[in-house]
Curated annotation (Swiss-Prot):
Cellular component GO terms, alphabetical: extracellular region
Protein name: Protein LIM2
InterPro entries listed in its UniProt record: Bifun_inhib/LTP/seed_sf (IPR036312), Bifunc_inhib/LTP/seed_store (IPR016140)
SMART domains: AAI
Disulphide-bridged cysteine pairs: 29-66, 39-55, 56-81, 68-88
């Protein structure tokens, strides 16, 4: 379970760093992605609770394009690190 917490934390940090590294995006995108850190406890495997209102508010504040671009960056990480693609369906 500790490794899953570490993975979830790492993913959230990557989200933040990916948003911060995009100079073409406004600081609003970076700040909004950073606010998603409040969703950290909800994204851990085994969590059956509902996300906090703070998490939901942060998610509502993120621009759709900003969120999609950040997710695309994260999904490309295995390739950039010479790792096999992640297949969540299997």
């Amino acid at each position: 379970m500790a490794s899953m917490k570490s993975l979830a934390t790492a993913i959230l940090v990557v989200l933040l760093l990916a948003a911060l590294s995009r100079e073409g995006r406004s600081q609003n995108c970076s700040a909004a992605i950073g606010e998603l850190m409040t969703c950290g406890p909800y994204v851990l495997p085994g969590n059956n609770g509902a996300p906090s209102e703070q998490c939901c508010s942060a998610l509502r504040a993120v621009n759709h394009g900003c969120l999609c671009e950040t997710i695309n960056i994260i999904s490309s990480l295995p390739d950039h690190c010479s790792l096999p693609a992640v297949n969540c369906a299997s």
